[in-house]
Amino acid sequence: MTTSGHACPVPAVNGHMTHYPATPYPLLFPPVIGGLSLPPLHGLHGHPPPSGCSTPSPATIETQSTSSEELVPSPPSPLPPPRVYKPCFVCQDKSSGYHYGVSACEGCKGFFRRSIQKNMIYTCHRDKNCVINKVTRNRCQYCRLQKCFEVGMSKESVRNDRNKKKKETSKQECTESYEMTAELDDLTEKIRKAHQETFPSLCQLGKYTTNSSADHRVRLDLGLWDKFSELATKCIIKIVEFAKRLPGFTGLTIADQITLLKAACLDILILRICTRYTPEQDTMTFSDGLTLNRTQMHNAGFGPLTDLVFTFANQLLPLEMDDTETGLLSAICLICGDRQDLEEPTKVDKLQEPLLEALKIYIRKRRPSKPHMFPKILMKITDLRSISAKGAERVITLKMEIPGSMPPLIQEMLENSEGHEPLTPSSSGNTAEHSPSISPSSVENSGVSQSPLVQ
């Protein structure tokens, strides 16, 4: 701005603008700065302006000052210190933040989320007062979940979080094609084959029956018990074979393989026998073709567990599961990172993820008009766990009632499984030698039994 043909002189002023050189601005903004001169600032200090110069209004000064400040780069702000959270309220491990209302570690956050989303039902095999810390947190799922509630973790937070994710993905779900990737297709085929080759379907078996205690319930029919325990031992060996054929299972530590097999063995045994249920005769058929009615199953050793198992078998009928779905569900039961005492639970969880995805896609492709069938089938795992927990207690009762007749492999599979007490005070030295169901490779030049789980 000029007046009377000459520019107003601009004296040096003490202020923030004097610390920055003016020369770069014409270089950076030549079209804007080139034709302008800075306004005089005399009026700010009470000095009259030189003749011929007008005093700018305060509004003009404020506007121009602000504009000038915007051109000046500010020094970078120092980074805030990292936020420090209180230890996990549940197990006292290092917290990763506030999850579901409390400070929690990643392990307890994931455990609580899975427990709520899957409606898990846990059982404490002690006095429901187990100590939960970073060392013991995987030993009792019941007490760990109760501790989560006690410290203030919120069910609603999990559900709200889930609903939020559902809304965010609802548009994607409408257009989802549910096509198998090559990897998932290969995984599904391997599991179907592993299941079929370790568990023949009902239509492949030549059924035969027995008249032994078929009409009325008794406490225990020793003849049926001997036959049942022999068949159960063979079934366990087939489950071990099935597990070893699951992609990735043998890549786990030996300890984790055994932990998973012990924890899931009864689940899979019950699932398998229930798929061989014939509702018209109310019978179940074993792998050698032996077919027992409900009364005989009770007398063979199932006892108070009998009606629970038959009810579960009836609930499976409307689901019309095929061999692929049964195999995948068995694999999901087995490979589960929630099992206590695992060395690498995160690795197990990651191994389970493609199994869940494969089952979801397979079910929805097979039943496109029944979108809710996948969660219905998956929820059967909760029922299986509840029944198998009672089944483990039943085996312990049988061990006390008929000492010396418990097959060693059944005993081993249930020993310390999911928090159960050992069936015997110490491992038997040479019982495995006398079991016709255990391969001779289980015993190597010694009278000491060696677990077939690690062969």
From Swiss-Prot:
| Expression sites by tissue | Expressed in aortic endothelial cells (at protein level).
Gene3D superfamilies to which the protein is assigned, alphabetical: Erythroid Transcription Factor GATA-1, subunit A, Retinoid X Receptor
Domain comment? Composed of three domains: a modulating N-terminal domain, a DNA-binding domain and a C-terminal ligand-binding domain.
* UniProt keyword list: Cytoplasm, Disease variant, DNA-binding, Metal-binding, Microphthalmia, Nucleus, Phosphoprotein, Proto-oncogene, Receptor, Transcription, Transcription regulation, Zinc, Zinc-finger
Pfam families attached to this UniProt entry: Hormone_recep, zf-C4
Which GO molecular function annotation, any one, does this entry have?
DNA binding
Q: Which disease is it linked to?
A: Microphthalmia, syndromic, 12: A form of microphthalmia, a disorder of eye formation, ranging from small size of a single eye to complete bilateral absence of ocular tissues (anophthalmia). In many cases, microphthalmia/anophthalmia occurs in association with syndromes that include non-ocular abnormalities. MCOPS12 patients manifest variable features, including diaphragmatic hernia, pulmonary hypoplasia, and cardiac abnormalities.
Keyword DNA-binding belongs to the record = yes
Report the residues modified as Phosphoserine: S77
Annotated segments matching region Modulating: 1-87
Q: Which GO terms describe its biological process?
A: apoptotic process; cell differentiation; embryonic digestive tract development; embryonic eye morphogenesis; embryonic hindlimb morphogenesis; glandular epithelial cell development; growth plate cartilage development; multicellular organism growth
What changing S369E does, per the record, is: Reduces transcriptional repression on DR1 and reduces transcriptional activation on DR5
Report the function annotation for this chain: Receptor for retinoic acid. Retinoic acid receptors bind as heterodimers to their target response elements in response to their ligands, all-trans or 9-cis retinoic acid, and regulate gene expression in various biological processes. The RXR/RAR heterodimers bind to the retinoic acid response elements (RARE) composed of tandem 5'-AGGTCA-3' sites known as DR1-DR5. In the absence or presence of hormone ligand, acts mainly as an activator of gene expression due to weak binding to corepressors.
Query: What is the name of this protein?
Result: Retinoic acid receptor beta
Q: Which GO terms describe its cellular component?
A: chromatin; cytoplasm; nucleoplasm; nucleus
Origin organism of this chain?
A: Homo sapiens
| Residue ranges annotated for the NR LBD domain, each copy included | 183-417
Substituting K370E results in: Reduces transcriptional repression on DR1 and reduced transcriptional activation on DR5
InterPro entries, A to Z: NHR-like_dom_sf, NR_DBD_RAR, NR_LBD_RAR, Nucl_hrmn_rcpt_lig-bd, Nuclear_hrmn_rcpt, Retinoic_acid_rcpt, Znf_hrmn_rcpt, Znf_NHR/GATA
Residue ranges, compositional bias (Polar residues): 53-66, 424-434
Top-level taxon in the UniProt lineage: Eukaryota
Q: What is its main location?
A: nucleus
Consequence when changing T123V: Reduces transcriptional repression on DR1 and reduces transcriptional activation on DR5
Q: Entry's SMART domains?
A: HOLI, ZnF_C4
Listed result of changing K365E: As a heterodimer with RXRA, reduces transcriptional repression on DR1 and reduces transcriptional activation on DR5. Reduces transcriptional repression on DR1 and reduces transcriptional activation on DR5
